[in-house]
């Protein structure tokens, strides 16, 4: 067979094999033409999934009469004039193949009118008959394209079409994609005479979120994180899935480059890497729009324009990664601050929450010890630690880099930072030995309300060096460690509450830990035990979400403590004594002042009070006093 130039109709049908895959492909090409023409409204009508009829109506600029026939010719376009234009293309179409290819496999009617024309004109082409007839018609400014009987002259192609429902699904999915990136356009879709989609123009962020909810679901729109980043000619905007969302957000994954939906492995890798700590191995939902200089991206690398090539791919990858990581960090900080504000506001309305974080200040003045340098000789209460526990655990588990602030909470312990808590002191008794003046003091109460509440309690022993109670037993003095007393008071409290079940306290921010394959079964088998301890644990998207814990675990590193606990109870159900010991060990000390510790001790039954007080160690005070006097 000799080499020859193909007839135009045959060449168009071959090209249609690339351009026209199914009805959704026709709609894509025609709607993109409408958008390139500046339309602000596009109405789509289809019958039988698009195989019977596809009709696109827009209010764009229209096509002049003398160009109607040319519009249906192959390689005819208004988008390009030179190779330089191709390097900086911003329009959807530019090859001039769509209308010619569609008209070669359907009965196509193109009706259009420009603002300058007094009447509209209509062009008609059918299958292999490439001659185009142009006649007058009635039509407002804009264009209407009808493609009837798709693949009527290529039975083999028609047999490959799926059911009407399947073809409609493909059309609907494509419309969702374009509706998100061109939110200023009013889109409607009718199927078999019934309107099924109506995407109204979105000119504000609130309106865009409504469209986002229409397309991607309310769960994603309500929990999505806003992304908006600009740097050195690159701009990334849109929404990403919140790593703390508890609801399924679907499989929304749309990425646009200069308004064009693309599928790119580089982009997907950057998104997965940004979420590596939060949702390991899971699909991430996102709607992201990247804008950059069109000279820096090549869109002419795929027949359907689904792929692009970035001239500086590594730079684009790093920009996307850093923009998403920044959005995740900022959202974590805002979530923490909002949760903290809520907790402070609700502190007097919910007994199930611990008291809010607060910074204590020293109160010197009239309550200073009148011996030597008061600032150096005054006795301070036991050290306190800032409430970093749960925040640090959440930060390590979720990859958040929240700027820590110096705030104090209850108790002292070994994890997290340690701070110094200052409280006012009262003058010692005049009858006290002078050598005790620098060592002993009774902590003052921070408010009149506390004084009223504690007025019925027996007098608290004096505090020695901020670490011990000094107890008098007849002619003997005994020292009781405040940390030891705090642990024992906590132990008795847990023992009293555990049988009825502990009350879980919501965390400021849920802690997420990568799940182990055996945890699901463990949670099912030990459900009653987990509830009894006040724990609320759920498994979602390959992550264990820690939502509530008893107050005794608030200061622990939950990201490691809870997995160790699940591993412990996996093979055996612990005894009550073992659970109590575990909670006590994890709790640290739940008191930030000797006065509160004393109030807690006095709230126990008298027998338990005596058990704890009996732990004090006798101090040979006569020997100690003799040593001090001899000096």
UniProtKB/Swiss-Prot annotation:
Against PROSITE patterns, the record matches this protein to: DNA_MISMATCH_REPAIR_1
Q: Which InterPro entries match?
A: DNA_mismatch_repair_CS, DNA_mismatch_repair_MutL, DNA_mismatch_S5_2-like, HATPase_C_sf, MutL/Mlh/PMS, MutL/Mlh/Pms-like, MutL_C, MutL_C_regsub
Superkingdom of this protein's organism: Bacteria
Q: Does the keyword Iron apply?
A: no
MF GO annotations? ATP binding; ATP hydrolysis activity; ATP-dependent DNA damage sensor activity; mismatched DNA binding
List this protein's GO terms for biological process: mismatch repair
Keyword vocabulary terms for this entry: DNA damage, DNA repair
User: Which family is annotated?
Assistant: Belongs to the DNA mismatch repair MutL/HexB family.
Q: What does this protein do?
A: This protein is involved in the repair of mismatches in DNA. It is required for dam-dependent methyl-directed DNA mismatch repair. May act as a 'molecular matchmaker', a protein that promotes the formation of a stable complex between two or more DNA-binding proteins in an ATP-dependent manner without itself being part of a final effector complex.
Q: Can you name this protein?
A: DNA mismatch repair protein MutL
